[in-house]
Amino acid sequence: MATYIVGDLHGCFDELQLLLKQVNYNPAQDELWLTGDLVARGAKSLECLRFVKDPKNNAKTILGNHDLHLLATLLGVKKVKPNDQVDAIFAAEDRADLQNWLRNQPLLIQHPKYGFLLTHAGISPEWNLTETIACAREAEAVLQSGHYADYIAQMYENTPDHWSAEWQGIERWRYIINVFTRMRFCYADKRLDFACKLPVEDAPNELKPWFKLDNPLFHQQDIIFGHWASLMGKADKPNIYALDTGCAWGNHLTMIRWEDKQIFTQERLK
């Protein structure tokens, strides 16, 4: 049995299949975990959703910001972005089933055997492990509730940019969602920054990657994330694994086999 974790798909279904072929993936014995953002920029977002949803493939994902945006567009509260290739999802006969399945996916997974944390964008530098898990479950409960559409319609803001246990309602939920699905850089005081999308070496001096801030969790815990393609897999910390390597942007799809930490890649198909 092997445990495989793959970075952001963004509709790159054929590349995923070639990666799995490289390792002779056997869903009867092996596990496949994904860092979210199954959909958007690649041509086969529908196929990605159906593959991960199908129990026979033994695949599990967490939610990314593009997955949440897809939910918002399916609900009619946001428009499809010009470069997103999701028309096939809107036309699919199983659209409602896919929508319901997607909103029931987690924001955070702790692997039951190995204990690593799987998140799309990151973990707040202000949270310990207990808070991290509790906040994920809290936000997931909203997405799985009957009033999730009201919250999704209000998630498109950058505030609050810091954590307070006193936050309630949409502000609290929005901070949690932004941490798990959008975060990249933070200030030294642990406030979130959403303006900078530059590579780390080109970012202003006052900004640091979230995983470089002072939080014991970032030293004690194995953390796997996607979202940040410009890192190109380099987090420069032995227990932090960045798996989004921009396949949808013309680079490659990355997968790690957890047992021996071997990396497998598949170049973007033309």
UniProtKB/Swiss-Prot annotation:
SUPFAM superfamilies reported for this sequence? Metallo-dependent phosphatases
Any idea which UniProt keywords this protein has? Hydrolase
Q: Which CDD domains match?
A: MPP_ApaH
Could you state a single Gene Ontology molecular function term? bis(5'-nucleosyl)-tetraphosphatase (symmetrical) activity
Pfam families referenced in this protein's UniProt entry, alphabetically: Metallophos
Q: Per its UniProt entry, what is the enzyme's top EC class, as one word?
A: hydrolase
InterPro entries in alphabetical order: ApaH (IPR004617), Calcineurin-like_PHP_ApaH (IPR004843), Metallo-depent_PP-like (IPR029052)
Q: What is its EC number?
A: 3.6.1.41
Q: Which reaction does it catalyse?
A: P(1),P(4)-bis(5'-adenosyl) tetraphosphate + H2O = 2 ADP + 2 H(+)
The record's function comment reads: Hydrolyzes diadenosine 5',5'''-P1,P4-tetraphosphate to yield ADP.
Which family is annotated?
Belongs to the Ap4A hydrolase family.
Its name, as the record gives it, is Bis(5'-nucleosyl)-tetraphosphatase, symmetrical
Q: Which organism is it from?
A: Actinobacillus pleuropneumoniae serotype 5b (strain L20)
Write the gene name.
apaH
